[in-house]
Amino acid sequence: ALPICPYYTSPDDNPIKKSDVERFTTQTMADIKQTISSLPAGTPVYGLSMGDDVQYYGGYNAKLERQIRQALGSSEMRLFSVIGNHDQDGKALYRRKWEENFGPTDFSFNRGDVHYVCINNCFFHRGMSYYSPGELRERQVRWLKQDLALTPKDMKVILCYHIPFTFGNAPFSKAKPLTNAHEEGHYSSSRLSLLLSLLKQFKGGYELFCGHTHFACNHEINYEGEDVMEHCHAAACGNIWQSNINICGTPNGYYVYSFVGTSISNCYYKGTFWDKSKQMTLFRAQTDFNGEKYAKD
């Protein structure tokens, strides 16, 4: 499984902004193809986009949508996509067009002994404003309960969504404040306890996969005395195609997961055009990097 977070920003044919799609095609997808070709022949491979496949900036762009689909579909792997906030921006038209081009916003599928659930947790409440941490509507909770009720309990479940459920600073009124001192002002989703109670029944275990933040983070939470990790994936576009790194310093890239039955037998981050053995860079003490602001155009 290859989780990727693309993010495109071209609203027109501006040659500068067209480079977003070009970089994804000639860098990210080219690197993914190299990774796939390095695997033993016959290895089943599939991809997951963690959302933000496109950014419309106030107008639907059929040409951009087509270019993105072509890029995402240019390898031999089957790819599934979660819808992100920028794929819809609070507009029914954008969400409908995304469904026409990519598929439903809430769906599930099986691969081997793993059951994937992809769900739209971008809850818009005023124009383009959305809750962070992510939230679910009642109808989605009903659908999720029905889906999991039909799933064999010896499978592993991987819940895929865009906005983290375990931390955010633009909360819904029922979101729960985080109690750690370094997380002051941040919250967990009002649905988190319910989600974990539904997932805990699976003997094969479960994982939480998200994107959205443009930094890499395994956020640890305690649920009923157990440590639970939410895997927040860095973005293929880094700091929105304005550099070669995410805002935390993680290089543009994607993740590679290997499964044996219900177990993740291997996992590594693949920096674009870096060897997979490249996993860390050390800097001298007192070297400052600003990871809180987006780079200027």
Protein language model features and the residues they cover:
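A short C-terminal boundary segment appended to hydrolase-like catalytic domains
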Residues: I247-C248, Y255-D297
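Short acidic, glycine/proline-rich loop/turn micro-motifs
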Residues: S10-P15, G127-Y131, A170-S173
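Short acidic, glycine-rich surface-loop motifs adjacent to enzyme active sites
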Residues: L148-A175
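Short, well-ordered beta-to-alpha junction loops that form the rim of enzyme active sites
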Residues: N121, C160-F165, H212-T213, Y269-K270
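Active-site glycine-centered loops adjacent to acidic/histidine catalytic or metal-binding residues
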Residues: I4, G51-D52, G84-N85, H162, ...
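N-terminal active-site segment of His-dependent metallophosphoesterases
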Residues: A1-G59
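Extended active-site neighborhood of metal-dependent phosphoesterases/phosphodiesterases
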Residues: Y56-K153, A175-E207, F215-F259
